Amino acid sequence: MKTFIVITFIGILSYAYADECENPEPMQGFSASQFYQGXWYVTHETSAXTLSECNILTTSNDNGKFTVKHKYTKDGXVGELICEGQASANNKFTYDCKFXGZTMEQVTRTAMDTDYNDYALYYLCTTYKXGPNAGKKEGHYILSRRQPNTEIPDALKTKTKDLNLKLCG
């Protein structure tokens, strides 16, 4: 009976924390105004289930309102997911992401490293607001480049070696 209780307790804990996101170290001195301008090509990510984040991201900054847009498909309809938000503490940015006016997810982006001109490494914690995954969280690391280059930059090789990044494509 004690074994059953312990196993049940471990199972409950595993389920309760399965949807938790990580809390990576944010980049010191991050400049949102330099980062949130122009296009970023997502070249690598850790999400094993889908490479849905492998898009071209269009970013902008309008007086502290940060926007990230990319191609999105829902129920066969293709359009644009528009994520808008503001900076919060510790170089984290929280967005509400909408498709055709419906909030699909809330995303917290942690900038981990960037040179602003070539590469960016960041972590996304996504909380799904609609669809079959509503209420669930998913976290993954993403590497983006200003050009569609498939190589991990030398400056990030040490930081990314244990992240199990997968090449998009």
UniProtKB/Swiss-Prot annotation:
The keyword Disulfide bond applies. Pfam families: Triabin. It is found in: Secreted. GO terms for cellular component: extracellular region. Expressed in salivary glands. The keyword Metal-binding does not apply. Keywords: Allergen, Disulfide bond, Secreted, Signal. Residues 1-18 form the signal peptide. One of its GO terms (biological process) is symbiont-mediated perturbation of host defenses. Belongs to the calycin superfamily. Triabin family. This is Procalin. It comes from Hospesneotomae protracta.
